[in-house]
Amino acid sequence: MSAQNLPYAPAQLAADLRALGVAPGGVVMLHASVKAVGPVLGGPNTILQSLFDVLAPSGTLLMYAGWQDLPDFLAELSPEAQAHYSAHHPPFDPATARAVRDNSVLAEFLRTWPGTRRSENPEASMVARGAQAESLTRDHPLDYGYGVGSPLARLVAARGQVLLLGSPLDRVTLLHHAESLARLRHKNVIHYTCPFLRDGRTVWLPIEDLDTGDPHDAYTFEEIVGAYLALGRGRRGRVGDANTVLLDAADLTTFAVAWLEARFGPDQ
């Protein structure tokens, strides 16, 4: 709530974002909690619009979307259940497939915003709006969707930033890119199939990736980001009511790779 005990106006959020270091022309990957920001005139749309306004005219906003209905668990099912899914599960459609709910409602708001582009890797799908949206999301590899050639790699190459808008430190999806680059003693490779529409029919294509959900070694993303911030890197502030952190994507990736290899590299 603002100092006047009123919902935040768009201009107030924009001023907070500028004070933190979000600037015109920037490429920003957002992780956000709408609830943490507090009451806002216009709700979630206003939060996104405030970011668009600050980044304009040549900036870009990026978010992780994924696919809420990703059928990556078929190998765990009975043959009968697998056959049922294979015959009837709708294919991945970048235009309509819902964003994963657990990350932020804003991902679905951004996915459906006019002018937004979406990458075509179902599990690692990203949505972006702005001047570099097309270049960030096009030709997303199906295999190793957080690695080389991914939207995350392009975020780093664009000297982009990661904005944690009331979001906890363990939500930094960019660190999956660091995991893919790091030389680690344990890298679990997983295989699954996913339905796509090809020439008017559903085709199940094989996908290979690192297991991003269950690392062998005991570490958390919160540890990595916390260690980075403890060195005085990154910027902290408030946007609305939300404790907010702004991170340099390239610098954080370099730090995270070194942090991981020092503790879990092949020689450790």
Regions inferred by a protein language model and the residue ranges of each:
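Short, structured patches in soluble enzyme cores that scaffold and shape functional sites
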Residues: A65, L164-P168
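Short, catalytically relevant binding-site loops at active-site mouths
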Residues: Q68-L70, S125-A128, L169-V172
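N-terminal active-site beta-alpha-beta segment that forms phosphate/nucleotide-binding
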Residues: A14, G21-L77
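Gly/Ser/Thr-rich active-site loops/lids in small-molecule metabolic enzymes
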Residues: S180-P206
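Internal, conserved structured core segments that host functional sites
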Residues: L74-L165
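N- or domain-start disorder-to-order transition segments that initiate the globular core
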Residues: S2-A15
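Acidic/aromatic/glycine-rich contiguous surface patches that form carbohydrate-binding/processing clefts
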Residues: D199-Q268
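A short secondary-structure junction signal
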Residues: N121-P122, G166-S167, T173-E179
